[in-house]
């Protein structure tokens, strides 16, 4: 779809605008999830409206209103996905359209569409300042966001590292599957194993034989959709609704698959803990049970070199809510060390989705433990990585984290954060949480405004 759009943009197309409209309609009617729509739809709209503006002297109120609706629809798709692809460009176009419309037409449009509106000028100011603060370009320009890979490791490293984590010799791992020579060559990257042989080795190491999967191993698209809804319910802290959704999912997934069972147990543990149905100690045990669906490793937290799946990382980071003392510190350090190592070799953009979740959890625990400077450093590193990937769904949370840790540090030195700074940062939190439709947090920040 992106290549088709690029052909339209840079080719000699007499019906450029019509083809852009066809692509918009196709994206809306085709089977695309929110993330995929956010990646391509705003780009189509941006180039469509950019071309339209060349003819703005011929616009009438109907054309202006239609273009405004198209622009707002593209921005709303970004909001649903928590992304900022072409956001600044679209906001500038929206402002430009509003400035050319008659005042009464603008008023009428706003009155008809007042529900959940965003203030374009206010939002663009916050977005631009945020990107400037973290030294990330605000405009898309020649960004290659379509072509990023996620959480990619060399198979030779996965086999070697995971085998060491399980404490297995090469002979023990390949027993009944393949020759030691084949495994040795695979661990050195000297050969590509047959798919079925590799799948059996990975299964023995607690890994899926599939090269790629999302939250669950299934071919049922409805299950994937339900899992996405479940994640939204948890993000919105609708835990009782999420629990019902999880029960509905349970009957539709194969729990004999270790990764699916791990997903279910991890979600069940989290929801029961958040609803106060289990103690901290019970919660840690439940997360440990979920983790051990795929990983049973002695002295895991003290290992220097590890390979963990994203779901295993989430099981471990969830456990921090119930841990204390040395065990918690070792666990946090293990995960942060894993990401630091990965970033050196691949960059954080390839691991950003779970990195955001993990750093948020780590910062909460470090801040509560009085490690405010380290917590702020991690938050700032995470914000920069998220902005670079055009992801802003939890930026509001991290801005508030930084403010909270700053308050604690100032209090230790006998000082206090000024009301002006408090209100400025809280307003940023309000605007960003509203943008990503996290209304629970938006209301929390509003209550804290002095």
PLM region descriptions:
Residues 1-2, 30-43, 81-89, 138-139, ...:
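Alpha-solenoid helical repeat architecture
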Residues 2-6, 42-50, 89-100, 158, ...:
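"A position-specific structural signal for the A-helix of alpha-solenoid helical repeats
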Residues 4-19, 50-67, 100-119, 230-240, ...:
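Short coil/turn connectors between adjacent alpha-helices in alpha-solenoid helical repeat scaffolds
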Residues 21-32, 68-80, 124-129, 243-254, ...:
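Amphipathic alpha-helical segments of tetratricopeptide repeats
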Residues 138-165:
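A short, Lys/Arg-rich alpha-helix, primarily the initiator
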Residues 164-185:
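Short alpha-helical DNA-recognition segment
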Residues 194-213:
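DNA major-groove recognition helix of helix-turn-helix/homeodomain DNA-binding modules
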Residues 219-276:
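Helix-turn-helix/homeodomain-like alpha-helical modules used for DNA recognition
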């Amino acid at each position: 779809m992106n290549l088709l759009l690029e052909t339209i943009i840079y080719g000699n197309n007499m019906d450029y605008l019509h083809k852009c409209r066809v692509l918009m309609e196709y994206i809306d009617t085709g089977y695309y999830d929110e993330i995929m729509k956010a990646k391509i739809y705003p780009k189509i709209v941006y180039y469509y409206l950019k071309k339209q503006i060349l003819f703005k002297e011929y616009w009438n109120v109907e054309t202006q209103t239609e273009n405004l609706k198209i622009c707002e629809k593209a921005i709303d798709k970004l909001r649903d996905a928590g992304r900022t692809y072409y956001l600044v460009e679209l906001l500038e176009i929206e402002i430009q359209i509003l400035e050319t419309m008659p005042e009464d037409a603008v008023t009428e449009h706003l009155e008809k569409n007042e529900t959940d509106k965003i203030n374009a000028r206010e939002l663009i100011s916050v977005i631009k300042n945020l990107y400037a603060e973290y030294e990330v370009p605000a405009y898309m320009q020649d960004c290659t966001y379509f072509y990023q890979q996620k959480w990619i490791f060399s198979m030779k490293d996965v086999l070697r590292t995971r085998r060491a984590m399980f404490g297995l010799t090469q002979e023990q791992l390949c027993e009944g599957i393949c020759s030691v020579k084949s495994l040795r060559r695979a661990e050195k990257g000297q050969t590509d194993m047959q798919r079925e042989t590799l799948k059996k080795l990975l299964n023995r190491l607690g890994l899926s034989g599939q090269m790629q999967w999302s939250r669950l191993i299934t071919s049922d698209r409805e299950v994937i959709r339900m899992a996405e809804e479940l994640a939204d319910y948890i993000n919105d802290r609708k835990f009782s609704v999420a629990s019902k959704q999880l029960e509905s999912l349970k009957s539709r997934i194969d729990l004999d698959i270790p990764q699916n069972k791990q997903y279910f147990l991890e979600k069940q543990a989290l929801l029961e803990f958040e609803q106060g149905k289990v103690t901290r100690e019970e919660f840690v045990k439940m997360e440990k049970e979920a983790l051990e669906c795929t990983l049973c490793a002695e002295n895991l937290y003290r290992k220097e070199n590890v390979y963990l799946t994203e779901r295993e990382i989430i099981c471990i980071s969830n456990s921090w809510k119930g841990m204390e003392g040395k065990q918690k510190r070792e666990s946090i350090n293990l995960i942060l060390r894993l990401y630091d190592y990965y970033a050196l070799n691949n960059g954080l953009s390839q691991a950003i989705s779970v990195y955001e979740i993990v750093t948020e959890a780590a910062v909460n625990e470090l801040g509560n433990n009085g490690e405010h400077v380290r917590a702020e450093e991690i938050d700032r590193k995470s914000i920069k990585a998220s902005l670079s990937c055009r992801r802003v769904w939890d930026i509001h949370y991290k801005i508030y984290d930084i403010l909270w840790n700053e308050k604690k540090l100032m209090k230790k030195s006998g000082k206090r954060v000024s009301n002006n700074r408090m209100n400025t940062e809280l307003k940023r939190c309000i605007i960003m949480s509203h943008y990503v439709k996290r209304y629970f947090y938006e209301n929390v920040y509003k209550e804290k405004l002095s």
